[in-house]
């Protein structure tokens, strides 16, 4: 079932992705999308959802029931289809000892839009399928260059931009995952110290499903003049999700989150942002506004938002972080 563009207010639909004959997407209201969950069981509790959601993100059990159960069912269909294709291909190649590589799901979107909450909820729901798949979640934060490198290269004010990531390490990690290698190491990151943690890794050992979450995971790269092969992060994805919202909403969520962190995590003397915990509320808000306009808004316009049309599925959020529309790429 597809929804005609006239059935939904244009403001509720991401950019120019309105549903219709010439759109690459089917677009559904949240209510219509919720019907696709069919008999998918709700395997999370309200307390678990509260534990999984990020600071200042009010996603609750009703939102899981309304949006995430249908998404879980859709992803189950995609994983099953990939397994069928794998068996057919191994028969074709007479490779009976071949082991299927992980199904990789990319989750992209702006800072403060709710990527981490989406990724964590999906990881829990998928791990509780009847088949009990092994599900791992990795974020791109660990692939940022250490602060010492960013400071040396004058990139601290562009942290989160493509140049601030060790793309080579990131691509080597995904290549190893898709090659089916065991015990692949992913670097880890501390949001308290705002830096990569030296010599600390998350070990990923041949999961059935890997969720890979980060702001720029759908970004393309310029082709080199010498004609060398340049893989992109999204080349390793079997399915991709973009979390979207109006710019004004993301702006307010970012500032509100900063002010909440000022009262919580920033209070720790170990926090990179501890200096903001003791200044006035007006001064802190002014700093948050500056960080938004000078760094995060520019990154959104230049590097994140242009990748939205590359996603297989777009969750468009409205006020209170609740999903209003879902756009699913046509096959």
Curated annotation (Swiss-Prot):
It is an enzyme of class 2 (transferase). Pathway: Cofactor biosynthesis; coenzyme A biosynthesis; CoA from (R)-pantothenate: step 1/5. It is found in: Cytoplasm. ATP binds at residues 109-116. Its EC number is 2.7.1.33. The keyword Ubl conjugation does not apply. Keywords: ATP-binding, Coenzyme A biosynthesis, Cytoplasm, Kinase, Nucleotide-binding, Transferase. GO terms for biological process: coenzyme A biosynthetic process. One of its GO terms (molecular function) is pantothenate kinase activity. It comes from the Bacteria. CDD domains: PanK. GO terms for cellular component: cytoplasm. It catalyses: (R)-pantothenate + ATP = (R)-4'-phosphopantothenate + ADP + H(+). NCBIfam families: panK_bact (TIGR00554). PANTHER family: URIDINE KINASE (PTHR10285). Belongs to the prokaryotic pantothenate kinase family. This is Pantothenate kinase.
